[in-house]
Amino acid sequence: MDFEKKGYTVLKKVLDQPVANFIYKYFLMKRKIADIFYKNKYIPPNSSEWGIWTDIQVPGTYSVYGDIAMETVLVELKPLMEKITNKNLFETYSYARIYKKGDVLHKHIDRFSCEVSTTLNLGGDPWPIYIEPGIEINLDPGDMLVYRG
């Protein structure tokens, strides 16, 4: 299996297009509402439950930690990830980010609790991920990359 050998594998169409599109539009709407809430001071500027634009990895890009929609996806996809990795996994956290044109997530090492991680494209244009220099992986909406964090 790819994961055992290479440390990553791509799973096509893990989420059906209507499901991926629904979650994608949900996050676009959540970002819009969060922007209104912050600008109109309905919520404190240091609040994070509606999402933030201050993540140091990709500043100025909307992201949200532990959203119930992504926590649900995490739990639902856990059996598939355990099968792919041949490991008993424990959910640690979910994190969603809406990339915009020009955003770059530079090479980094995930925290220790992310021994196995996943990236899931929910919507927008296909975009490349570079696992290692010269290894480009393109994900369409609904596709998922499982990798050693």
Predicted features along the sequence, with ranges:
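Generic beta-strand or strand-like secondary-structure segments
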Residues: E76-L80, Y95, S117
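Conserved active-site beta-strand element of glycosyltransferases/polysaccharide synthases
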Residues: I98
